[in-house]
Amino acid sequence: MDDELEPLDRYLDDRKAKRRKRVRKFLTRPAMTTVLRSTVLGEENVRGLEGAFILVPNHSSHLDAPMVFSLLPEWLTERLATGAAADYFYRKRGISSLTSLFFNSYPIERKGERGRAAGMTGRLLRAGVPILVFPEGTRSRTGEIGQFKSGAAALSISVGVPIVPIAMSGGHEAMPVGASFPKLRSEVFLFIGPPMHAREGEGAEAFMERVVHAIKLMLEQRTPHPLNADGSSPFGEEDDAEARSA
């Protein structure tokens, strides 16, 4: 079905949102907290955030999406949707149904037809649905941050929604590329930065460079409140002020 014709009802449905909430509360969150030792810091940075936004984490493990949906505050992920690789998660009906249930997902093609995926993502954002995007496009094989594509920043600018940077640490060690199961009781950290907006006249690539810089600083300084070498906030003065007043 063409993205332009696909209805958005299921992404906005209150009953489906409540069903996902129950699944996460009684299944996926207990499972993740049993398998992993997790710490989430920075909720104060996004307190009061409403409407659509784009969650942008680094990506180093198959655990990353489950950690975002299961470990971040419920109110932040209640309506969160994400694209899932069509060639991996949508080949079989059972797997696609579970993926949609757990992650409120929609299929994206990893090769070709990227415009259709961006079109669907933009439609959801305009409808008020927050989106999870991994701009690296694939998991890091070394655990180091890879090249972030600027598509999420372009959407943020065109739709007028903020990017919320998420720094994830420990996922690669818990379940690196090639592993079938995570290492039990591995320690993971999720640092939530404050919402970031493009500056006046700032292009998508420059904006994404600032987002990546903020994520790297959160990882290096092990805090959701990192500082640049000159003592300024990497999130921008306005973003930092919003976080302090929330």
Where are these regions (language model features)?
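A generic structural signal for well-ordered alpha-helical segments
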Residues: 31, 75, 99-100, 124, ...
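Structural motif corresponding to alpha-helix initiation and N-cap regions
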Residues: 40-43, 92, 115-118
